């Protein structure tokens, strides 16, 4: 039986801080949540410019999974259907479709994180 809350993030990048501030913000947030006992999954679109510049390919504080397309993301979201929440970050490739896909999974909670708000 799972006791920790499970959160699934779909974000721009966690694995590469090259050319974006999202990775550093996500890293700090997820490290803090992990320290509080959350089970964390981060789903990141595998794009060539981040693939060539990964500075955190295997984070120790969450499960990072790269996906190639929306069909693959659908399978990953189904795999994590037991999550307590799905959180989708701003600037995710195919953002509208990703939100629609996540909503169709009817998670207990679905949230949008405008990670660019402080900018």
Question: Where does each model-flagged region fall?
Answer:
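Non-catalytic N-terminal targeting/anchoring module and adjacent flexible stem/linker
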Residues: 1-2, 84
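Extended catalytic core of nucleotide-activated donor transferases of GT-like folds
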Residues: 19, 26-31, 40-119
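Nucleotide-activated donor-dependent transferases that construct or modify glycoconjugates
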Residues: 2-19
């Amino acid at each position: 039986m799972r006791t920790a809350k499970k959160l699934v993030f779909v974000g721009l990048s966690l694995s590469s801080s090259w050319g974006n501030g999202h990775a550093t913000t996500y890293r700090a947030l997820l490290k803090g949540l992990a320290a509080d006992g959350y089970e964390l999954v981060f789903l990141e679109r595998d794009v060539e410019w981040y693939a060539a510049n990964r500075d955190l390919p295997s984070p120790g504080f969450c499960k990072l999974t790269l996906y190639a397309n929306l069909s693959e993301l659908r399978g990953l979201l189904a795999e994590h259907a037991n999550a307590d929440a799905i959180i989708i970050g701003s600037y995710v490739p195919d953002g509208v479709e990703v939100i629609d896909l996540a909503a169709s999974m009817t998670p207990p909670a679905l949230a949008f994180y405008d990670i660019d708000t402080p900018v």
